[in-house]
């Protein structure tokens, strides 16, 4: 058994990322090479402002980011072709190609690309096939699925069994993925979860592939400090977003090495860990640990974690700005679906949370609206501040009727009826199982003036009404599961401004 400096067993973790996963699946379906085919996964029927789910590696080589908006792809390809036509014989294109190797060899060809409509069910099927490959080598309790295209594996106890190093095992798994699915992958290996993630995200992207075309990077705490303490931008590191980077830059910290040195400062010095805690609160502890390459959390810890408060919800971006009454239809649909989800999972809630995001068109010149407080979005655009509120229910429930009553009342209380709306987020808080509610002791305040016979009868009638509604909800779920989500609908779903029917054809907000 290998041991670390503190006498503890030294762990071996592998992180695997499927390269441009959605784009690679689309290329595979078309029998095209994912590494040389210019392809984006995006629904162009949603206008060119739609975000691309994936961009193939060859198209990325022209400076297109992985999560570009479609209009950015269109603009960049136009720029490339503007330069190419100057070098084309007779300043004229003889044709077009989506094959990047062909484009490199033939200056007379126009750069072209495929726009593939998202097919989420297909991607989930392929991801499941790849997960089954992981299971050939590692037990499910030692795998953490981070996303549809990324996993972490604790391979500590497998290396002696397979008589392999972590690098050899990672290479074997990746080669099998490529042979079985034609999808390329990269891997990071580390002595903790953070290091394997950073090795994959940063180091593997900048190394040459091995003889099999596979990129695998390894990091230990020491090699991490040598290689990455000076790395910029700091946003390349896991969990360091633009907000963190901005706060750090304002106090003169630009790298993980800077953060690590700051944490060593003595009391009374400007740069010390107190500065980081003032900036980030308790999150500073995690940032300092990561700056040093430390991460105590294991996959077993991740699997065992149970949050103190459970919630579930959904959000959607409307395809065009909706007015107050139009949005109310969608809010009611979302509450109804949330109630069905609770019934399906045998859960109940006692609080609804609603967030409404307004559209930037509310601030267009010539509009005379009381927009209230103005804020700035992620893209630096001015827009009215979102509306947010909670509605407490009198009891834990999954009743669509009770939840809708509370949700619509909340909607009227918090939303500005004069403004156009673009985003809706609906959540159920304090979610617990039906069994937990049944086990809870119920208390009631007694008084001399209540007719408890009438009160008991009213309570029984109320419970009967709720039970009838639940039976109806369960029947609807059975029909939807057997014949499809649109097999049974409510009248409101057939209204022109309803979105439920279209959402039912989607997975994760994208076409199934």
Identify the residue ranges that each predicted region occupies.
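Gly/Gly-Pro- and Ser/Thr-rich, intrinsically disordered tail segments characteristic of DNA damage-repair
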Residues: 1-299, 448, 455-512
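Short aromatic/hydrophobic contact patches that present stacked aromatics
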Residues: 152, 392, 425
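Hydrophobic, well-ordered secondary-structure elements that form the walls
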Residues: 354, 426, 484
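DNA-contacting surface of Y-family translesion DNA polymerases
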Residues: 6-8, 15, 236, 242-421, ...
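Short, internal active-site loops enriched in acidic
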Residues: 156-158, 191-196, 356-363, 429-435, ...
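Generic "edge-of-domain/loop-turn" microfeature
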Residues: 46, 160, 194, 317, ...
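C-terminal hydrophobic structural anchor segments
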Residues: 409, 413-478
């Amino acid at each position: 058994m290998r041991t670390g400096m503190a006498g503890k067993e030294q762990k071996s973790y592998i992180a695997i990322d499927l390269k441009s996963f959605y784009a690679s699946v689309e290329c595979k379906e078309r029998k095209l090479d994912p590494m040389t085919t210019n392809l984006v996964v995006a629904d162009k029927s949603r206008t060119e402002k739609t975000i691309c789910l994936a961009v193939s590696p060859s198209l990325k080589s022209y400076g297109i980011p992985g999560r570009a908006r479609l209009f950015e792809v269109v603009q960049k390809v136009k720029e490339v072709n503007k330069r190419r036509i100057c070098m084309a014989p007779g300043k004229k294109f003889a044709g077009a190609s989506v094959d990047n190797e062909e484009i490199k060899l033939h200056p007379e060809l126009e750069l072209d690309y495929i726009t593939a409509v998202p097919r989420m069910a297909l991607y989930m099927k392929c991801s499941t096939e790849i997960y089954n490959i992981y299971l050939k080598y590692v037990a499910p309790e030692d795998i953490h699925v981070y996303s549809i295209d990324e996993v972490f594996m604790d391979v500590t106890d497998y290396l002696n069994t397979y008589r392999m190093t972590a690098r050899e095992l990672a290479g074997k798994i990746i080669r099998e993925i490529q042979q079985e699915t034609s999808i390329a992958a990269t891997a990071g290996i580390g002595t903790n979860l953070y290091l394997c993630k950073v090795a994959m995200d940063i180091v593997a992207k900048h190394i040459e592939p091995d003889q099999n075309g596979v990129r695998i990077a390894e990091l230990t705490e020491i090699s991490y400090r040598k290689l990455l303490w000076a790395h910029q931008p700091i946003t390349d590191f896991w969990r360091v977003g633009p907000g963190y980077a901005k706060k750090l830059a304002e106090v003169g910290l630009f790298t993980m090495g800077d953060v690590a040195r700051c944490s060593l400062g003595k009391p009374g010095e400007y740069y010390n860990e107190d500065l980081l805690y003032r900036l980030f609160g308790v999150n500073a502890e995690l940032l300092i640990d990561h700056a040093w390459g430390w991460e105590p959390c294991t996959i077993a810890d991740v699997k065992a974690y149970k949050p103190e408060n459970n919630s579930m919800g959904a959000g959607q971006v409307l395809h065009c700005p909706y007015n107050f009454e139009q949005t109310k239809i969608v809010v009611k649909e979302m509450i109804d679906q949330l109630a069905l989800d609770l019934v399906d999972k045998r859960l109940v809630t006692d609080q609804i949370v609603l967030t409404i995001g307004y559209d930037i068109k509310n601030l267009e010149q010539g509009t005379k609206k009381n927009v209230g407080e103005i804020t700035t979005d992620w893209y630096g655009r001015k827009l009215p501040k979102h509306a947010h509120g909670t509605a407490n229910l009198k009891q834990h429930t999954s009743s669509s009727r009770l939840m809708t009553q509370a949700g619509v009342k909340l909607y009227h209380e918090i939303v500005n009826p004069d403004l156009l709306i673009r985003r809706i987020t609906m959540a159920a808080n304090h979610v617990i199982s039906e069994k937990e509610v049944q086990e809870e002791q119920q208390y009631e305040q007694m008084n001399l003036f209540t007719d408890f016979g009438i009160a008991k009868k009213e309570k029984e009638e109320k419970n009967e009404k709720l039970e009838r509604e639940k039976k109806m909800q369960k029947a609807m779920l059975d029909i939807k599961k057997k014949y499809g989500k649109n097999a049974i609908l409510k009248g409101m779903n057939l209204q022109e401004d309803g979105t439920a029917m279209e959402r039912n054809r989607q997975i994760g907000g994208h076409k199934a």
